[in-house]
């Protein structure tokens, strides 16, 4: 079955306090985004990789690829107004039938095992997302203040989120709403159940300077 991945990288680095978009910040001597693409190429040499970038960042990305002699083959699609529209633009380059994953460009530490697990389970379940346990205590805000909730009833969601191509294309044919916070929420809006797979704790989303320090330590 043909497999593809859409890697979404539309960050502007605001929480980093940097003028350089977070996906381009260096970790271990090269941009975060290059580590991410390499993780998926290691998973499958034939995997179709589609990188979604804002148009105004694409020339800079090409420059970085030349400077770092980056040779992982990939297509580039234009970023959209929101993540929803960016994924939709990437999907336009994916042909059915097959499986397609959607991954955050600033999650470079996803393991091969998690990638493989999500794609394999998607062959059976059609919609799969990686999750990890909540280890912190959670509180629910109420009109009266707040209250403790059982963390065993919650999971932290990661990427790649993997789906049948036809299913995800149909889901992204829906009208956008702010409640679409990830691809699973878009699919669930059609009443399709989403299967949970075990993720990896190191698969953090690099969005703050502290995350960069963690990333450097992981390398």
From Swiss-Prot:
Site residues, Transition state stabilizer: 15, 22
Pfam family, one: IspD
SUPFAM superfamilies in the record: Nucleotide-diphospho-sugar transferases
Keyword terms, alphabetized: Isoprene biosynthesis, Nucleotidyltransferase, Transferase
Group of enzyme by EC: transferase
Gene Ontology molecular-function annotations: 2-C-methyl-D-erythritol 4-phosphate cytidylyltransferase activity
Substrates-to-products reaction catalysed: 2-C-methyl-D-erythritol 4-phosphate + CTP + H(+) = 4-CDP-2-C-methyl-D-erythritol + diphosphate
Enzyme nomenclature, EC number: 2.7.7.60
GO-annotated biological processes: isopentenyl diphosphate biosynthetic process, methylerythritol 4-phosphate pathway
CDD domains according to UniProt: CDP-ME_synthetase (cd02516)
InterPro entries: IspD, IspD/TarI, IspD/TarI_cytidylyltransf_bact, Nucleotide-diphossugar_trans
Pathway(s) the chain acts in: Isoprenoid biosynthesis; isopentenyl diphosphate biosynthesis via DXP pathway; isopentenyl diphosphate from 1-deoxy-D-xylulose 5-phosphate: step 2/6
Swiss-Prot/TrEMBL site (Positions MEP for the nucleophilic attack) positions: 151, 205
Keyword Chloroplast on entry: no
Family: Belongs to the IspD/TarI cytidylyltransferase family. IspD subfamily.
Alphabetized PANTHER family for the sequence: 2-C-METHYL-D-ERYTHRITOL 4-PHOSPHATE CYTIDYLYLTRANSFERASE, CHLOROPLASTIC
Stated role: Catalyzes the formation of 4-diphosphocytidyl-2-C-methyl-D-erythritol from CTP and 2-C-methyl-D-erythritol 4-phosphate (MEP).
Record-given protein name: 2-C-methyl-D-erythritol 4-phosphate cytidylyltransferase
Provenance organism: Bacteroides thetaiotaomicron (strain ATCC 29148 / DSM 2079 / JCM 5827 / CCUG 10774 / NCTC 10582 / VPI-5482 / E50)
Name of the gene this protein is made from: ispD
């Amino acid at each position: 079955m043909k497999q593809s991945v859409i890697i979404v990288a539309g960050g502007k680095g605001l929480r980093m306090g940097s003028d350089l978009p977070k996906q381009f910040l260096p970790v271990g001597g090269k941009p975060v985004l290059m580590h991410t693409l390499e993780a998926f190429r290691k998973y499958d040499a034939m995997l179709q990789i589609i990188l979604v970038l804002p148009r105004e960042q694409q020339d800079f990305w090409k420059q970085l690829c030349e400077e770092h002699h980056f040779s992982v083959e990939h297509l580039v699609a234009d970023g959209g107004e929101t993540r929803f529209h960016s994924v939709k633009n990437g999907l336009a380059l994916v042909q059915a039938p097959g499986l397609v994953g959607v991954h955050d460009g600033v999650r470079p530490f996803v393991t091969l095992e998690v990638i493989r697990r999500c794609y394999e389970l998607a062959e059976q379940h059609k919609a799969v997302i990686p999750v990890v346990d909540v280890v912190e205590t959670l509180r629910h805000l109420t009109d009266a203040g707040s209250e403790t909730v059982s963390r065993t009833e919650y999971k932290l969601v990661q990427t790649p989120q993997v789906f049948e191509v036809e299913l995800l294309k149909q889901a992204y044919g829906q009208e956008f709403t702010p409640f679409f916070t990830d691809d699973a929420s878009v699919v669930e809006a059609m009443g399709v159940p989403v299967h949970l797979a075990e993720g990896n704790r190191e698969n953090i989303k690099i969005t703050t300077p502290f995350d960069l320090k963690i990333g450097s330590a992981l390398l």
